[in-house]
Amino acid sequence: MIHILQSVSNMDRGGIESMLMNYYRHLDRTRFQFDFLVNKKKPGFFDDEIRALGGRIFQSPGVAPQSYPAYLRSMQQLLAQHPEIKVLHAHNEAMQLFALEGAKKAGLPVRIAHAHNTCLPKDAKLPIKWFCKQFIPGAATDYWACGREAGIYYFGQSAWDARGVTLRNAIDLDRFGYRPQVRAKLRAEYGLNDKLVVGCVARLMAQKNHTRLLD
């Protein structure tokens, strides 16, 4: 069995985490298994389900700049102790560099960098994240993204055109199928009657691009 290590912040109900769980639930777990390397020291919403599916959750030292040497050592120790892990699938915006570099130093043969965004958050950590972003292509063996624009932003156009892979976010369509009784209940609850309703399911964050919807 091949174990794939997913590097994330923690397994709460965010977009990346939900996408991973949608894939995980339908994975052929006789051949592949997901394990999770989390950076935040708090329980995640999906932790119990992960363990029920046979996955393991490992704690990293965190992705603060001062933790970088400890992170590299921790990653090398983890992969030495668990040779069944053959693949790293890294998320975490630009800070995924920590996991990618640690896996590279440990000699892990497959290191997937996954771009989920077309920009970096403009916060106090922006200079550090921008610096880390420049080194991701050299630390990864494979370039994945949710779309072409995100791939070009993280890896550059030439690298993306040569090696990029678009991984569509997995969605369990049965959960969102049309159900007349649910429609009637919600319309009655919110007093919508037969009005035209345009729904948008997303956090109120810049990367969700609500301005395009409003325009």
Where are these regions (language model features)?
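A conserved mid-protein helix/loop that constitutes part of the nucleotide-sugar donor-binding site
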Residues: 14-22, 196, 200-215
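Short hydrophobic "strand-cap" motifs at the C-terminus of beta-strands
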Residues: 7-8, 146, 167-170, 200-204
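An amphipathic, basic-hydrophobic alpha-helix
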Residues: 49-56, 61-87, 97-101, 105, ...
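Short His-centered aromatic/hydrophobic patch
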Residues: 90-96, 115
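A conserved, positively charged/aromatic
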Residues: 105, 112-146, 157-160
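N-terminal strand-loop element at the rim of the active site
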Residues: 2-70
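A short, active-site helix/loop in glycosyltransferases that binds the activated sugar's phosphate group
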Residues: 139-177
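A short helix/loop element that forms part of the nucleotide-sugar donor recognition site in Leloir-type
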Residues: 75-76, 177-191
